[in-house]
């Protein structure tokens, strides 16, 4: 998003709107983010875009995680991250400064590289890149979030009774393709009696209980490591109201 704002800043500095820079597009272009033509050079240009350096704490975490894993092979990732966070808090300022200085040095290099990168683009290229940048940013953000939650050991969501049934019956279902197998399983599920479905409903309830218990434990760990932003909204509200009552 920061890069997108930088791009838009270039357009503003030129004193022209997106529509003005695309004179001739006519009614096909209704907003700065509505495009009907995306040049092939998008990928190559975006690939050459400088990447922001990681923060001093994240640099420290990436460095320490393999060490902690080797020392504690049976420990969960969330526990390792909690220990690393504690180690960072206890780290003397003189040692933290090493990571902070490295970040500042890389940030300065990044600023120079991004400046040179933007100078190579024409206003029309900037216009065309905006949508691609936005799309890639949103996809990357979602993917990063998913990877982060996996790394932090967030519990898997509970399965429905139908999903439990699919997992059990899919492999043996008739069909030459996954789509055909799934269709068969779906039809078989519809034909089950309520009493036959009850077994899978019970499994789903047990999975719901498992998820609730694991999430409660996981969110307590996230609070310990300073990641309250990952709590469910209902939990955040409960903690907020609880604090107000105190």
Swiss-Prot record:
Q: How is it modified after translation?
A: Phosphorylation by PKA within the HMG box 1 impairs DNA binding and promotes degradation by the AAA+ Lon protease.
What keywords were assigned to this record? Answer: Activator, Disease variant, DNA-binding, Mitochondrion, Mitochondrion nucleoid, Phosphoprotein, Primary mitochondrial disease, Repeat, Transcription, Transcription regulation, Transit peptide
Which residue interval is the transit peptide?
Answer: 1-42
Q: Which residues carry this modification: Phosphoserine?
A: 55-56, 61, 160, 193, 195
Gene3D superfamilies given in the database record: High mobility group box domain
What InterPro entries does the entry give?
Answer: HMG_box_dom, HMG_box_dom_sf, HMGB
Phosphothreonine modification sites are: 122
CDD domains for the chain = HMG-box_TFAM_rpt1 (cd21986), HMG-box_TFAM_rpt2 (cd21987)
**So what does mutating residue 162 to A actually do?**
Moderate reduction in DNA bending
Q: Where is this site: Intercalates between bases and promotes DNA bending?
A: 58, 182
* One CC-aspect GO term: nucleus
Q: Per the UniProt entry, what is one GO biological process?
A: positive regulation of DNA-templated transcription
What are the DNA-binding region positions? 50-118, 155-219
Q: Name one GO molecular function term.
A: RNA binding
Localisation per UniProt entry:
Mitochondrion; Mitochondrion matrix, Mitochondrion nucleoid
Top-level taxonomic group: Eukaryota
State how it assembles: Monomer; binds DNA as a monomer. Homodimer. Component of the mitochondrial transcription initiation complex, composed at least of TFB2M, TFAM and POLRMT. In this complex TFAM recruits POLRMT to the promoter whereas TFB2M induces structural changes in POLRMT to enable promoter opening and trapping of the DNA non-template strand. Upon metabolic stress, forms a complex composed of FOXO3, SIRT3, TFAM and POLRMT. Interacts with TFB1M and TFB2M. Interacts with CLPX; this enhances DNA-binding.
User: What the record says about its domains?
Assistant: Binds DNA via its HMG boxes. When bound to the mitochondrial light strand promoter, bends DNA into a U-turn shape, each HMG box bending the DNA by 90 degrees.
Question: What function does this protein fulfil?
Answer: Binds to the mitochondrial light strand promoter and functions in mitochondrial transcription regulation. Component of the mitochondrial transcription initiation complex, composed at least of TFB2M, TFAM and POLRMT that is required for basal transcription of mitochondrial DNA. In this complex, TFAM recruits POLRMT to a specific promoter whereas TFB2M induces structural changes in POLRMT to enable promoter opening and trapping of the DNA non-template strand. Required for accurate and efficient promoter recognition by the mitochondrial RNA polymerase.
> What disorder does this protein's entry note?
Mitochondrial DNA depletion syndrome 15, hepatocerebral type: An autosomal recessive mitochondrial disorder characterized by severe intrauterine growth restriction, neonatal-onset hypoglycemia and liver dysfunction, mitochondrial DNA depletion in liver and skeletal muscle, and abnormal mitochondrial morphology observed in skeletal muscle. Hepatic pathology includes cirrhosis, steatosis and cholestasis. Progression to liver failure and death is rapid with no evidence of neurological impairment or other organ involvement.
Q: What is the protein name given in its UniProt record?
A: Transcription factor A, mitochondrial
* Record organism: Homo sapiens (Human)
Which gene specifies this protein's sequence? TFAM
